[in-house]
A protein has these predicted regions:
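Active-site-proximal or metal-binding-adjacent scaffold patches in catalytic folds
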Residues: 1-112, 122-165
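Walker B beta-strand of ABC/ABC-like P-loop ATPase nucleotide-binding domains
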Residues: 115
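Walker B catalytic acidic pair
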Residues: 118
């Protein structure tokens, strides 16, 4: 479980698995007799987890972008949620903000860091000193952007060690 995602895995009694929702919690019910040692079953579990993350990301992330963009007086075009493992987010020259569904595994401060990072790109489409100054201005704290960037890198390395995304 994370700040934005509650997930429970249960062993089922039926031959097929299921992804369901009980309030804010996603429940993955595994097929009866499923053995996660089998690579095919691992692929099934990965697909179901990805779908749970996608659904939750579509609920949670666009409103965060909307609220924070409004707070900072910024305009963006659209928010897209993507199954991207190579980057947490991006901002296009058209003002589209793309966010990885895998952000649902991150602590809330890092989710906001990625959102702020992409919002800063609406004004500065690079990582210049002006970009970092814009990001720090969002936080009202000099150096906060680079601090959170390093924290995000450490989080990503930890996920890789655990064989997550």
């Amino acid at each position: 479980n994370t700040d934005l995602l509650q997930l429970r895995i249960e062993r089922g009694t039926q031959p097929t698995g299921l992804l369901s929702r009980k309030g804010k919690e996603f429940v993955i019910t595994m097929p009866a007799g499923l053995r996660l040692e089998d690579p095919r079953n691992q692929a099934w579990a990965q697909r179901v987890l990805t779908e749970a993350l996608r659904r939750r990301a579509k609920e949670v992330l666009p409103p965060i972008v909307h609220e924070e963009a409004a707070r900072f007086g910024l305009r963006y075009n659209r928010v897209y949620i993507k199954d991207v493992k190579s980057r947490w987010g991006s901002c296009s020259s058209l003002g589209n903000i793309n966010l990885s569904l895998w952000l649902m595994l991150a602590p809330i401060d890092l989710v906001y860091y990625v959102v702020y990072h992409e919002l800063a790109h609406l004004n500065e489409m690079n990582h210049s000193a002006r970009f970092w100054a814009q990001l720090d201005a969002f936080y009202g704290e000099p150096g906060r952007g680079k601090f959170l960037e390093s924290k995000m890198k450490a989080f990503a390395l930890d996920l890789q060690r655990r064989n997550m995304p």
